[in-house]
A protein has these predicted regions:
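An N-terminal, well-structured beta->alpha segment
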Residues: 4-101, 108, 190-191, 196-224, ...
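Conserved phosphate/anionic-ligand binding catalytic regions in large, soluble enzymes, centered on
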Residues: 37-57, 141-142, 228, 232-244, ...
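N-terminal small/polar loop signature for handling phosphorylated ligands or for N-terminal nucleophile
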Residues: 85-148, 246-306
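Short acidic, glycine/serine/threonine-rich loops at helix termini
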Residues: 95-100, 125-129, 147-153, 174, ...
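Glycine-rich phosphate-binding loop plus the immediately following alpha-helix
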Residues: 154-184, 322-345, 350-361, 416
């Protein structure tokens, strides 16, 4: 079956000149042909993601066209404006895939609003809402290595597509022949027919205004003298982040030169992920050279941001996603109360795998904190619920431990642009009162306890990877562990049982241990890996770290 599909591809006059030579190179290599053609990339709520190359199990123009035809079939049943917003990041062929998607939509009579240059996830979410679109498409593979690309699909609210809608689109994709079942005109024809238009300056300006309206202490950054090092990690963050920082008065910014401009090969780091040290290393070195107060790095699609803070002894320390989430929550709450801008009955939303320290901080400020499943769409879902009740202004902040933050309802996905603005404003504020981010973080730990949150990952590559992951998760359910690292399990929460959790079904297990530590086990939604999340609480960092190490060691044989 897969051999036949391979031969069909080989017989085509393929429009992408890279694909035929690639197919010829694997001739006779059964394992390689099977990997590329035995299955197709699956379309889920996060859309598509895969390695670039020829085949149904790879990202290429034909897979993008087929996916877009499936999306178009769904859009045509939705009424409304019959419009889709499209954007893309700096990855290899992102601009090509975005134009291919626009061309297929136009061939189906659907209007398109596409950015004329790369713009990040939050800008796509905003444009989807601004133009009252039926859907949005963002061409990106987020922080994956350079060989990957992807295709994120958004619903009319600017939130990642719902499970139900994604299932319909996937069914339509499966019914569509990858070569003969797709309607197609050229991008130029779509423009000529008036079906494809570029996103206007009015939309871009409204996006920046919506972000800048969420300053906690407007004008403060202009006079604080904050010194910043910033890296867009060769992605799409450069223009929007620098625009907003300049607008709020953060002007002493040094950009990491090797990572300034878009480059989908990500030559300075193999994994452009602001969670890891290697991606931030150049920025950290530059921060030390320039004696910066703060270093920021946004990922390629600028929906996540990592930071390093200057410590009193002049060294720099990476701040985790959980710590930044708690710092921003604390800063937003304290600042809004001080300025009289806190709404009545404010709501904060975090994922179930994010730190319980946020619960303690929210309680201190009298803020309702809601915990939702992993994936920012669930935070967007909470905002949508508030909006439906006419209470959208109650939402003040949402975050995930994986470095994603949002501080307003203007978009429905994580936004590294507003996060960068608020982190800089927060740093400027603490600088202006003779404090620092580091000092405030230590004060928070002193007040609430020394929480430690760590994430480990176990990778399962290849065609059998997903089966191995499923087998491990089933094994944990069939034979529940009674202890980890000598700590007895006091409670198991299985999120596949919505009747017990009150949340939609999800493949997540949470183990509560004696003493209050927790271990979370869940397969990644976008990569072939199982993630383990540890939360430990000690009298100091060393005690919390020692417990985490014990727990992690005990899990290795279970997940190997």
């Amino acid at each position: 079956m897969y051999q036949k599909e391979y031969e069909r591809w080989l017989s085509q006059d393929l429009a992408d000149a890279d694909l035929t030579p690639e197919l010829l190179r694997i001739q006779g290599n059964d394992e390689e042909i099977k990997d590329r053609f035995a299955v197709s990339l699956a379309f889920g709520t996060a859309g598509l993601r895969g390695v670039l190359g020829a085949g149904t199990n790879r990202m290429n123009i034909y897979v993008v066209r087929q996916a877009t035809q499936g999306l178009a079939n769904w859009v045509k049943t939705q009424g409304g404006n019959q419009t889709v917003a499209v954007s893309y990041d700096s990855r290899i062929k992102s601009d090509v895939f975005a134009k291919e998607a626009a061309a297929v939509l136009a061939a189906n009579g659907i209007k398109v609003r596409i950015y004329d240059a790369l713009m990040p996830v939050p800008a796509l979410s905003f444009a989807t809402r601004y133009y009252n679109c039926n859907a949005g498409v963002m061409v990106t593979a987020s922080h994956n290595p350079a060989k990957y690309n992807g295709y994120k699909a958004y619903g009319p609210d600017g939130c990642q597509m719902t499970d139900d809608a994604a299932a319909i689109v996937y069914a339509e994709i499966q019914k569509t022949d990858i070569f003969t079942g797709v309607k197609y005109i050229s991008f130029a024809e779509g423009v000529e027919q008036g079906l494809i238009k570029f996103v206007g300056d009015d939309c871009k300006d409204a996006f920046y205004a919506a972000i800048e309206d969420r300053q906690v202490r407007p004008g403060l950054a202009k006079t604080a003298g904050l010194k910043l090092v910033y890296s867009p990690l060769n992605g799409s963050g450069l223009v929007p982040v620098m625009r907003v920082l300049k607008d709020i008065g953060v002007t002493d910014v040094t950009i990491v030169p090797e990572q300034e401009y878009p480059n989908g090969y990500f030559t300075t780091c193999s994994y452009p992920n602001p969670e890891i040290y290697a991606a931030l290393e150049l920025g950290l070195n530059l921060a030390k050279e320039t004696d910066a107060d703060l270093m920021l790095a946004t990922d390629p699609d600028a929906d996540r941001v990592g930071i390093a803070m200057k410590c009193p002894d002049g060294s720099y320390e990476l701040v985790t996603g959980n710590e930044v989430g708690v710092l921003l929550l604390d800063y937003i709450c304290a600042g809004r109360i001080e300025k009289g801008t806190m709404p009545a009955n404010p709501v904060v939303v975090k994922s179930i795998v994010s730190t319980p320290l946020a619960d303690a901080v929210a309680k201190h400020y009298g803020v309702e904190l809601r915990s939702v499943l992993t994936g920012f769409k669930w935070i967007g879902d909470q905002i949508a619920g508030l909006e439906a009740a006419g209470e959208v202004d109650r939402f003040i902040f949402g975050f995930e431990e994986s470095y994603g933050y949002l501080a307003g309802p203007y978009v429905r996905d994580k936004d590294a642009v507003i996060a960068s603005m608020l982190i800089c404003e927060m740093a400027a504020y603490y600088r202006s009162i003779g404090s620092s981010i580091k000092q405030r973080l230590e004060e928070i730990y002193k007040e609430y306890g020394r929480y430690l949150n760590k994430v480990d990952s176990f990778e399962f590559p290849g065609l059998t990877g997903m089966d191995k992951m499923a087998s491990i998760m089933q094994g944990l359910r069939d034979n529940p562990p009674k202890e980890f690292g000598g700590y007895a399990v006091t409670k198991v929460t299985d999120y596949k049982k919505p009747e017990e959790t009150g949340l939609p079904s999800a493949n997540v297990l949470i183990y509560t241990l004696e003493g209050g530590a927790t271990v979370v086990v869940r397969p990644s939604g976008t990569e072939p890996k199982i993630k383990t999340y540890f939360t430990t609480l000690g009298k100091d960092l060393a005690e919390a770290q020692a417990q985490k190490d014990k727990l992690a060691e005990s899990l290795k044989p279970v997940l190997s």
